[in-house]
């Protein structure tokens, strides 16, 4: 996967390549799809969610510029694979998943594989995880129509927020926000297609 899919597409960070060579992606894929686990394609994981294709995971991990000991927030745990890659790179990972069943499954898989530096919580990712802010990097694995302000607020100085932005009917763009000492710098990159970032429904009274 690393030599055939990632290096040829420009992924160069050795920490990313080493992490993705080590994390067993097939453990994060439902049984009907395990034979496809190492192909460069997204795969369904249930509840209308997917595990991102390896290149996207590699790109987001590289763009986040993770260093050992970095505190990283992930929005959209999904299968737990992205969190495992970040943990393998030495990050302390806080990950939020809105679907309780996926959060439990991911937490179980991560525990079985020994990733003790990952904390999983079920909840609304739009709000981030303010109790543990600020974060050196924030990785969002589903697409909001606009970047949630709470996530920007929880980014440390010199931190980077990696997020696909756009609607399901119009273009989505992978976007990198950097909080510099002078303010926020935004860079839009290539077009992508992600599932929407969903929110908790308001309580009816």
UniProtKB/Swiss-Prot annotation:
Residue ranges of the TM segments: none
Catalytic activity line of the entry: [protein]-L-isoaspartate + S-adenosyl-L-methionine = [protein]-L-isoaspartate alpha-methyl ester + S-adenosyl-L-homocysteine
GO molecular function, one term: protein-L-isoaspartate (D-aspartate) O-methyltransferase activity
One protein family per Pfam: PCMT
One cellular-component annotation, GO: cytoplasm
Gene for this chain: pcm
Family per record: Belongs to the methyltransferase superfamily. L-isoaspartyl/D-aspartyl protein methyltransferase family.
Enzyme Commission (EC) number: 2.1.1.77
One GO term (biological process): protein repair
Protein name: Protein-L-isoaspartate O-methyltransferase
Domain of life of the native organism: Bacteria
Enzyme active site: 52
Enzyme class per UniProt: transferase
InterPro entries noted in UniProt: PCMT, SAM-dependent_MTases_sf
Entry-linked CDD domains: AdoMet_MTases (cd02440)
Chief location: cytoplasm
Subcellular localization: Cytoplasm
Function: Catalyzes the methyl esterification of L-isoaspartyl residues in peptides and proteins that result from spontaneous decomposition of normal L-aspartyl and L-asparaginyl residues. It plays a role in the repair and/or degradation of damaged proteins.
Alphabetical UniProt keywords: Cytoplasm, Methyltransferase, S-adenosyl-L-methionine, Transferase
Keyword Glycosyltransferase: no
Organism whose genome encodes this protein: Gloeobacter violaceus (strain ATCC 29082 / PCC 7421)
PANTHER family: PROTEIN-L-ISOASPARTATE O-METHYLTRANSFERASE, PROTEIN-L-ISOASPARTATE(D-ASPARTATE) O-METHYLTRANSFERASE
Record-linked PROSITE patterns: PCMT
């Amino acid at each position: 996967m690393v030599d055939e899919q990632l290096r040829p597409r420009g992924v160069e960070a050795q920490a990313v390549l080493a992490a993705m060579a080590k994390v067993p992606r097939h453990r994060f894929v439902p049984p009907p799809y395990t034979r496809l686990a190492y192909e460069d394609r997204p795969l369904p994981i249930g509840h209308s969610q997917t595990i991102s294709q390896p290149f996207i995971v590699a790109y987001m991990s590289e763009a986040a510029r993770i260093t050992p000991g970095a505190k990283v927030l992930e929005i959209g745990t999904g299968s737990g694979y992205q969190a495992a890659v970040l943990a393998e790179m030495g990050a302390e990972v806080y990950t939020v998943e809105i679907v309780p069943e996926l959060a439990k499954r991911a937490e179980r898989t991560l525990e079985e594989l020994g990733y003790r530096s990952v904390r999983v919580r079920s909840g609304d990712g739009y709000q981030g995880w303010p109790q543990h802010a600020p974060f050196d990097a924030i990785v969002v694995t589903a697409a909001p129509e606009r970047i949630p302000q709470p996530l920007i607020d929880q980014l440390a100085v010199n931190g980077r927020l990696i997020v696909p932005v756009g609607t399901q009917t119009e273009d989505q763009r992978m976007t990198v926000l950097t909080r510099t000492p002078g303010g926020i710098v935004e860079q839009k990159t290539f077009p992508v297609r992600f599932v929407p970032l969903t929110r908790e429904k308001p309580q009816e009274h």
